[in-house]
Amino acid sequence: MSLSTEAKAKILAEFGRGANDTGSTEVQVALLTAQINHLQDHFKEHIHDHHSRRGLLRMVSARRKLLAYLKRTEAARYNELIQKLGLRR
């Protein structure tokens, strides 16, 4: 259920600050968002997959914490990121 290497590379190129930037908050949030969207599609077909749903909730929680950190430290980058990802806040 993880993202393909190509999908991750595309996200890194779009949201990363450099070629090897995998740890910045923006990249982490973008990767989590892609995984969350992938799991949401999975749940449309597999409604009773509660084990994966627990993982989804953990990802949503981690993304929420990262977004709160980014909003607290650098509000301009936060606003730009949620606009790019199409998240509502």
From Swiss-Prot:
TM segment ranges: none
Alphabetical UniProt keywords: Ribonucleoprotein, Ribosomal protein, RNA-binding, rRNA-binding
Record-level GO BP terms: translation
Residue pairs linked by disulfide bridges in the UniProt entry: none
InterPro entries: Ribosomal_uS15, Ribosomal_uS15_bac-type, uS15_NS1_RNA-bd_sf
Pfam families in the record: Ribosomal_S15
One GO term describing the cellular component: cytosolic small ribosomal subunit
Gene Ontology MF terms in the entry: rRNA binding; structural constituent of ribosome
Assembly behavior: Part of the 30S ribosomal subunit. Forms a bridge to the 50S subunit in the 70S ribosome, contacting the 23S rRNA.
Cited PANTHER family: RIBOSOMAL PROTEIN S15, BACTERIAL AND ORGANELLAR, SMALL RIBOSOMAL SUBUNIT PROTEIN US15M
Protein task: One of the primary rRNA binding proteins, it binds directly to 16S rRNA where it helps nucleate assembly of the platform of the 30S subunit by binding and bridging several RNA helices of the 16S rRNA. Forms an intersubunit bridge (bridge B4) with the 23S rRNA of the 50S subunit in the ribosome.
Protein family: Belongs to the universal ribosomal protein uS15 family.
Name of this chain's protein: Small ribosomal subunit protein uS15
Gene (name only): rpsO
